[in-house]
Amino acid sequence: MDIRRGVAEANGIELAYEDMGDVLHPPILLIMGLSAQLTLWPLGFCELLVKAGYRVIRFDNRDIGLSTKLSHLKVSGPVWKRFLRAQLGLPSPVPYTLHDMAEDVRGLLDFLQIPSAHVVGASMGGMITQVFAAKYPQRVRSVGIIFSSTNQPFLPPPKPSALKPLMSGPGKGATREQIIAHSAKFMRIIGSPKYPFTQDELIALATEMNARSYHPAGVVRQFNAILGTGSLKHFTRRIEKPTVVIHGTADPLVRPACGKAIARNIPKARLVIIPGMGHDLPPGVWERITH
């Protein structure tokens, strides 16, 4: 399958993207989550969508992968205060928010001269999708939200076993091998117990991601963008386009109740709960999601 790679000037920054399928076919824009490069939309998953008759675009969000790193922006103050405020649905001062990342999406579509697209977001990408679909309904044909949240008050937080490695990282001075091992361990913790990857597969994926880009400071800013935005509920309720919300029963990072909250707040949204799916996209769930 041919992949058209490029860098888009969007919202004052550069976004690396990959564009697949016939440019005359209906476009699907895939938005990935926290600390996740575009490669975490598996190529096989994208190929299924192309074979189904779609043009597929995946891209690196700001501060990740090959897109612009906003290293001049600094996060100040204790993160636990922002985390507690976020649990109450309250915003906090941060370098940028999910609103800025939604503007990146608009800029990418403008650059590619795509008037409207089917927009699918995973995790933080699903949060960006909610903001974008509410603010720019004319740019959205339909909405897909995978293991995400409204971030409204009193939703269950991540399990400590999933949150701890996300917050702590591999540690200062970690070697490349230690960084890769930490990434593989984290992917196993949040992964789908019904559709597990082998250790060799996880190490290979972590190695590929590390070789492409490693920028932990950008992940910190992305995480604070989530915390600083506050509740999305008032945006979620404004989504009018056909919407499917997909969540796994075994997600330890963004709990199933969070996906259910999204579906409750979007008129006529369809909720799909996948048994044994965690916070990843293993091949065993691709057919279910793409259909």
Short names for language-model regions:
Residues 86-95, 99-117:
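Conserved acidic catalytic loop of the alpha/beta-hydrolase fold
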Residues 252-258:
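Conserved alpha/beta-hydrolase "acid-adjacent" motif
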Residues 268-291:
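Catalytic active-site module of serine/aspartate enzymes centered on a nucleophile-bearing elbow/loop
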Residues 115-157:
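Conserved hydrolase catalytic core segment
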Residues 158-234, 241, 261:
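Alpha/beta-hydrolase
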Residues 239, 245-247, 251:
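Short beta-strand/loop motif that positions the catalytic acidic residue
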Residues 13-88:
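Conserved HGGG/HGGXW glycine-rich cap/lid loop of the alpha/beta-hydrolase fold
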Residues 1-14:
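N-terminal cap/lid segment of alpha/beta-hydrolase-fold proteins
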